[in-house]
């Protein structure tokens, strides 16, 4: 292949919303910054919005949202194979004039398995748990892996888990691209929600809680630990389901929540640093209920660190390794299930706050997305130029 050639890349994506899919945005923009001859178009399907739409993302990349007839025909959660086959046929037709394919997440498995003849990259943000405990699915997954030119994983523990599980054997085409934030990921326009938060917070110390929208993310335990520390408040970023909100209100009472917890609802990724910079620390927990949780190191962990906030995390291997190596927070002696241990970790961090925050300031540039440019370059070379 010649570097002057212009490459049209089709990116196949299952997403809750393109403007909220931060990792994809960073990957595309980084590749286009390093290779001005690589051009993307996103082909997206979403869990709720089954309609066709074309446009341009907020970061300037053309997209097409796909309509799948099978999703209209069959109820949600049923006829998965028929829907997957429908997606494959649609993608095959849509991408016939493209030079290369980028598939994101396990949901695009059938496309990875059946699309041939073009350079193929499979970006596994999540572990393919549905393929791990069924012999037929495992066999099909291994075939799909062989069909790829490059695979990308969110961190080393996830890749090691797939290797130890016997799902991956050829490590020469495996790359790790961690979901670090970008330094300029901040919106300088402040909306009414933020102004209301600032007025509500006053001079109080605040804990940053993002994405605690499920029991496995220790929502009740995290809020309970904050409320156990006098004069500490919390800001909860992101949507909380009616079911979880009802449980939280029943556990702590509406009056106490109104005084010490501020719920922002869904906000755009670029606005999150506004709230982080008003907080003293963050809690990040994923209970050990499945591998995707246990091997997680979410973007909000790194967002807090590059913005100067120490963190309290659970014993999950990727997050614990960061705390043990750099001393930028406290690792609680729990996966998030024990409120008392989380509270102890918060108090420990507060007692040693100046020392820990100094380490955060010293190390925070280690977790910038741009630090991985050489990895991204090698991924593209292996994918398109081999």
Mark where each language-model region is.
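Nucleotide-activated donor-binding/catalytic signature segment of Leloir-type glycosyltransferases, i.e.
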Residues: 238, 246-274
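Conserved donor-binding/catalytic core segment of Leloir-type glycosyltransferases
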Residues: 8-13, 152, 181, 194-217, ...
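Nucleotide-sugar-dependent
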Residues: 22, 214-218, 270-275, 282-303, ...
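A short, active-site helix/loop in glycosyltransferases that binds the activated sugar's phosphate group
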Residues: 111-112, 146-174, 178-186, 247, ...
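A charged, aromatic-enriched C-terminal amphipathic alpha-helix characteristic of glycosyltransferases
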Residues: 22, 192, 334-340, 350-382
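Glycosyltransferase donor-sugar binding loop
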Residues: 47-48, 210-212, 233-248, 265
């Amino acid at each position: 292949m010649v570097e002057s050639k212009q490459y049209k890349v089709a990116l196949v994506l299952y997403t809750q919303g393109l403007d909220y899919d931060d990792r994809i945005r960073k990957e595309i923009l980084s590749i286009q910054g390093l290779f001005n001859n690589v051009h993307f178009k996103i082909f997206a399907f979403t869990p709720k919005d089954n309609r066709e739409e074309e446009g341009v993302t907020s970061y300037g990349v053309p997209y097409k949202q796909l309509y799948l007839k099978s999703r209209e025909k069959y109820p949600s959660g049923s006829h998965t194979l028929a829907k997957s086959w429908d997606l494959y046929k649609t993608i095959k037709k849509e991408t016939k004039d493209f030079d290369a394919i980028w598939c994101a997440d396990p949901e695009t498995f059938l496309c990875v398995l059946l699309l041939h003849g073009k350079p193929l990259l499979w970006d596994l943000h999540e572990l393919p748990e549905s393929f791990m405990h069924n012999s037929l699915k495992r066999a099909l997954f291994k075939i799909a892996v062989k069909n790829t030119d490059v695979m990308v994983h969110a961190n080393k523990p996830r890749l090691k888990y797939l290797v130890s599980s016997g799902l991956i054997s050829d490590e020469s085409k495996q790359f790790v691209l961690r979901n670090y934030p970008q330094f300029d990921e901040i919106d300088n326009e402040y909306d009414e929600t933020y102004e209301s938060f600032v007025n509500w917070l006053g001079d109080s110390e605040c804990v940053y809680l993002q994405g605690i929208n499920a029991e496995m993310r220790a929502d009740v335990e995290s809020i309970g630990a904050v409320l156990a520390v006098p004069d500490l408040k919390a800001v909860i970023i992101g949507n909380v389901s009616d079911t979880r909100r009802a449980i939280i209100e029943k556990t702590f009472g509406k009056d106490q929540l109104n005084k010490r917890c501020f719920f922002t609802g869904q906000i755009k990724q670029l606005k999150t640093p506004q709230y982080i910079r008003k907080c003293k620390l963050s809690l990040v927990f994923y209970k050990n209920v499945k591998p995707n949780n246990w091997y997680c190191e979410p973007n909000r962990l790194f967002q807090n660190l590059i913005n100067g906030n120490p963190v309290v995390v659970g014993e999950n291997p990727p997050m614990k390794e960061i705390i043990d190596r750099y001393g930028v927070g406290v690792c609680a002696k729990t996966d998030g299930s024990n409120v008392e241990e989380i509270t102890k970790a918060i108090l420990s961090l507060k007692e040693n706050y100046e020392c820990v925050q100094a380490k955060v300031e010293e190390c925070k540039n280690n977790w910038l997305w741009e630090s991985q440019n050489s990895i991204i370059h090698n991924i593209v070379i292996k994918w398109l130029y081999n």
